[in-house]
Structure formats: structure tokens, C-alpha cells
Regions:
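Active-site entrance/lid segments in N-terminal catalytic domains of soluble metabolic enzymes
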Residues: 1-162
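Active-site metal-binding loops of divalent metal-dependent hydrolases
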Residues: 20, 172-173
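Conserved active-site-proximal phosphate/metal-binding subdomains
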Residues: 146-168, 174-252
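Cytosolic juxtamembrane amphipathic/interface segments immediately preceding
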Residues: 251-259
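Divalent metal-coordination and catalytic microenvironments
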Residues: 264
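Juxtamembrane boundary at the C-terminal end of a transmembrane helix
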Residues: 275-284
Length: 284
């Protein structure tokens, strides 16, 4: 099929694999791009040197366009952006910050730019900043979510009515039926995170993948609103977080509770302790 998203990124299908930290390395990005979509490398858990390595391996593995997702609040964001521009990555998806800082520089380096938003207000600001496309992500998404808690079904048509640039829908989409629904709401492409996090090429542990595949409705909950709304699997760790929040734990206490557990889960297990849908702390 052909539309503004496929034309913008030079892809066959308007399907983007979200650049999730700890899950989206060069293997997953290359596989998605080879299949006709747009694979993204998740830079939010990488050092600049490691990202450069992933970019070069991805480019060697596929002749198709690919991209990098950069959370703008990441401590290495500036160095990561320098790597992205030096390597002339075809597409850059930004999130968790203002796109105004980098969009012009990325365009000058030949990169197409999309920004992830959770509200119409920030979609308009992104358009004003000059991005090429917007990803409207509803709060059904795994990992970090917007504070507005607007569902994809409500968010996408409102954003579509407000902006003129190409629109990508995200959050709770995992099948062709979900893609069809997103298009009916006005989207021209979709971004999926969890579905690709559970693929063979994902870096997440097999135990984590099996757990997520077995989830049913009600198996995930939104938590951690003091430090950034995050969708977590409903298990012992979620109960510990909920208990801490109910007693009024500070943001600092919640951060200490989190520690590095999500990384341990994704890479090796500890499934009874902590886990988030598509990984706690994943940018989907």
C-alpha cells in the first residue's frame, strides 16, 4: 500500500516497530525493515558508542530504511543525537521531551523526524516544531504513558482533526484489526511495541516473552504516576508499588523501589518480582 507514511519513510507497509529500550536492537530493527516496515533501534538504554555499533550492524544487515528512537530526557540524549546525525540515520523518532531542540538539526543531517505525543496540545506543538509526522500514543501502551490517560480510540481522531502532517497511531495495537481501526480513526500508520518485543529477534528474555503472551485483560495496570505513568503487569511487584503509592510514598522512594529490576527481568527473568508490559520502562 502507499500513503503519506510509506512515502515519507520509503517503506512498503505503514507499520513501525517501536524503539523499546532493552528490546529493540539492530536485529529486530533490521528484521522489521526487511519485511517492509520501519524498524527502530531503542537508544534509551545504550551508550553512544553502543548505539553507533547497532546502527552500523543494522545498516549492514538490511538495505532498507530504519530508524532510532531517542527519549529526549535520557542522560545521553545529546551524545546520542550526535551519533544519529553523524551516521545519517534515515528516521529518528523522539519522545519524552520537546522536539523543537533537535528537529532542525536532524533535518539538516538528512533525517526524517517523528515525535511521540499523548495529547492534541503536544501534537500541535510538534507540528509547529517542524516534525515530519506525529505518533499519537494512547495510554493502553506498554511502558511509559502520558499523564493525560487518554485512550487511543479517543486520542487519534482528536489529533487527526488538529494537525495536517502524517499521523501514526500507537497504544494497544497488535493485529491487522487494530491497524484497520486506527486507519478508520484517521491514522496513516501504526506503531507497535509489545507485539515486536515478544518476537524472536527481540532482546527480551524468553521467560518474559512467555509471560506476556499469556496475559489477559486486566493483567496490566497503570502505576507510578508520581514519576511517570507506567503500565505494569499485575503481579507481586505491582502490588508492592501499589502499596507504596497508597501510603503516600515519595517519588524518590518509588525510584528506589524500582532500582534496576526491570532490566534484570527483561534480560534474565525475576518474573515474580517485577515486570512491565512490553517491559517496565520501555518507550513503545
Amino acid at each position: 500500500m502507499e500513503n503519506r507514511i510509506t512515502t515519507l519513510f520509503g517503506i512498503r507497509y505503514p507499520i513501525i516497530a517501536g524503539g523499546m529500550i532493552w528490546c529493540s536492537g539492530w536485529r529486530l530493527a533490521a528484521a522489521v525493515s526487511d519485511a517492509g516496515g520501519l524498524g527502530l533501534i531503542g537508544a534509551g538504554s545504550m551508550t553512544p558508542d553502543l548505539l553507533r555499533e547497532h546502527i552500523r550492524k543494522c545498516r549492514a544487515a538490511t538495505g532498507k530504511p530504519f530508524g532510532v528512537n531517542v527519549p529526549l530526557m535520557y542522560r545521553y540524549a545529546e551524545q546520542i543525537m550526535q551519533v544519529v546525525m553523524e551516521e545519517r540515520v534515515p528516521a529518528v523518532f523522539t519522545s519524552a521531551g520537546s522536539p523543537k531542540t533537535w528537529t532542525g538539526q536532524l533535518h539538516a543531517a538528512g533525517c526524517k523526524v517523528a515525535h511521540v505525543v499523548s495529547s492534541t496540545k503536544f501534537a500541535l506543538k510538534s507540528q509547529e516544531a517542524g516534525v515530519d509526522a506525529v505518533v499519537a500514543e494512547g495510554f493502553e501502551a506498554g511502558g511509559h504513558n502520558g499523564r493525560e490517560e487518554t485512550a487511543t480510540m479517543a486520542l487519534v481522531p482528536q489529533v487527526r482533526a488538529a494537525i495536517t502532517i502524517p499521523l501514526i497511531a500507537a497504544g494497544g495495537i497488535a493485529t491487522g484489526r487494530g491497524m484497520l481501526a486506527a486507519f478508520a480513526l484517521g491514522a496513516e500508520g501504526i506503531q507497535m511495541g509489545t507485539r515486536f518485543a515478544l518476537s524472536e529477534e527481540s532482546s527480551a528474555s524468553d521467560a518474559f516473552k512467555r509471560l506476556c503472551i499469556g496475559l489477559e485483560e486486566g493483567g496490566t495496570m497503570l502505576a507510578l504516576k508520581k514519576i511517570g505513568p507506567t503500565r505494569l503487569i499485575r503481579n507481586d511487584f505491582y502490588t508492592a508499588v501499589e502499596t507504596a503509592e497508597n501510603r503516600g510514598a515519595s517519588a524518590e522512594e518509588l525510584k528506589e523501589l524500582l532500582g534496576h529490576t526491570p532490566f534484570q527481568v527483561l534480560m534474565g527473568g525475576l518474573l515474580g518480582i517485577a515486570v512491565g508490559l512490553a517491559g517496565a520502562w520501555l518507550y513503545a
